[in-house]
Amino acid sequence: MIAGDNLHNTLRLLRHNVGNDIQVYRFSSKLIPLATHESLSDWNPYEALREPFAAVGKYVKEHGLRVSFHPDHFTVLSTPRPEVLKSSIRDLNHHVAMFDAMGLDARAKNNIHVGGAYGDKPTAGARFRENVAALPERIKQRLTFENDDKTFNAPETLELCEALSIPMVLDIHHQWVNHEGETPAELWPRILATWQTPYAQAGSPADDPLPPKIHASSPKSASDPRGHADHVIVLPLLEFLRSIAPITDRVDVMLEAKLKDGALFALMEDMARYQEDGVEILDGASVRIKP
């Protein structure tokens, strides 16, 4: 069974991550192919794959990993079409059910974009807000919202996060190509506050709160500034981390680079070159930044 192989290989990847000090991981949303297809509505994949799901969840908990999903682009809560909204909610329920099958609490999040503007961004934003507010609590407590690179920018996404008490994942690359003149550091105090809400910290012990998360990537080329490069250029990320360090104890950085862990290893080598400039290497995938 493909789904069983996917879960087995996911466990192998997690072991690789732990061996390289990587504590943050995004699961593939395609772990169970066609899981939400109507023709398979009588199949319960979470029960059929109970043991491999549980094995993945057990490993995550044993090693204190922070995991997430990024449901596909067709999961759109700003849509004006009822059938698309229904499909989107079904997909979110599926992602929550996978976390539940792993035995993971609400610290495991589903990250989504606001979605399309459909020719009227204010109306689309209001529709998104209404649709999110109507979601079951089990879905809302696992949500994060991310600014995108073309439509809903960082200030607009942040306003929705604040209105709905949902944490915001700041994508600093998206913010660079889609902004209103603000800098990401200017928005950061408000973004940080979204990670202190009950939804953001659902499942977190009081003495070990879930840290905020950002996405980092670099432009593929001058002609394709929105595309992701193979690697992440160190200086823009380092400058941002320095700017938020005075008010930020911890932050998870999800790299979106074509070379995946290879990009991380290269970035850590680049970070090590700044050890005399306030960068302390903690392990193979973590740094401490002095303001």
Predicted regions and their residues:
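Short helix-terminating capping/connector loops at secondary-structure junctions
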Residues: 18-20, 61-62, 103-107, 203-210, ...
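Histidine-acidic metal/acid-base catalytic patches
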Residues: 166, 177-291
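N-terminal pre-domain/capping segments
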Residues: 1-63, 67
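Active-site acidic/histidine proton-transfer and metal-coordination neighborhood
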Residues: 45-163
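Active-site beta-loop-alpha junctions enriched in small/polar residues
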Residues: 30-32, 72-76, 113-117, 146-150, ...
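Acidic/histidine-rich catalytic cores of soluble enzymes
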Residues: 125-207, 211
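Hydrophobic faces of well-ordered beta-strands that scaffold small-molecule active sites
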Residues: 23-27, 67-71, 108-112, 141-146, ...
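Well-ordered, non-membrane alpha-helical segments in soluble/globular domains
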Residues: 3-11, 46-53, 88-93, 125-132, ...
